[in-house]
Amino acid sequence: WLHRNLLGGGERLRLGAEIMGIGGTTGGTDYELTLAFSRPATFGSDTDFFTNAVISSLNEPNFSSDRVSIEAGVHRYATPEREYSLGVGYTAANTMDTFGTRSYRILTLPLSAEFDYRDDDLNATKGYYAKASLTPFLNLRGTTNGARGFIDTRAYRSLGADKRMTFAVRGQLGFVAGPSLRNAPADLLFYSGGGGTVRGHNYQSLGVDQGNWNTIGGASFIGLSGEVRVKTGEKLSVVGFYDTGFVGSKVVPRNRSGNWHSGAGLGVRYDTGIGPIRFDVAAPVG
């Protein structure tokens, strides 16, 4: 539910509820309730104030988490292509993984920068996109002080005057610094596998192996993807892609501290005019 003019000044209030993973073969059912409020032009014409609250229950393949988080901050639109945000937040969670049941409470200072120079954010054929986020956190209970960082970059290049062939690449890099894996919040660590990381592998199938079929999340993550899209008609395209991912036990990714896996596949894209619909088939290749 969305109200676009709550107080008469363009304020937006969004209430959301989501259920995920129904009938899935990995993990369980996830639930999430969200409340988000934003007020435009609060600190100048290009700077909005925002606040949000999220209540979630996650039942993932290797951990579960019941979490409440609140955040408030500012979002600045520097140009149509560049955005920045700064906030302060609080998170309380109860988690369960290989190390048992734990709870933590942290204060957070989330920072982000986003650059979008694509010709179309839903069906890009040229340009690039990058988003970097850094969230230092202060321990109140159950963990230690630290920070979580994540970078997502994408680039696109097309050939020919009619742009019938498009090359797309993506790189992701993440880390959790400060607490050890045993003391780190389980829902802040990294896994790889499934859509968004390495297609062809089960969701979150790669983490840090603890032996006896037990896996936890990693302190570092690398994701690399490449694909080629070829138009076969005005609306239809075929796609070939290759993904690889790494999860490590150390903040600085090193081969000896973790493992890689890869997947490849083919897909079909149909352009609806408001965005593409896509169907992929992938398999592990390493």
Which functions belong to the PLM regions below?
Residues 2, 92, 96-102, 106-235, ...:
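C-terminal outer-membrane beta-barrel translocator/porin domains of Gram-negative envelope proteins
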Residues 2-131, 198-200, 204-215, 219, ...:
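Gram-negative/organellar outer-membrane beta-barrel architecture
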Residues 12-13, 164-169, 277-280:
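Acidic/polar loop patches that form or flank catalytic/metal-binding clefts of enzymes
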Residues 46, 77, 84, 243-245, ...:
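Flexible, small/polar- and glycine-enriched "cap/hinge" segments at structural transition points
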Residues 253-286:
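C-terminal beta-signal and terminal closure region of outer-membrane beta-barrel proteins
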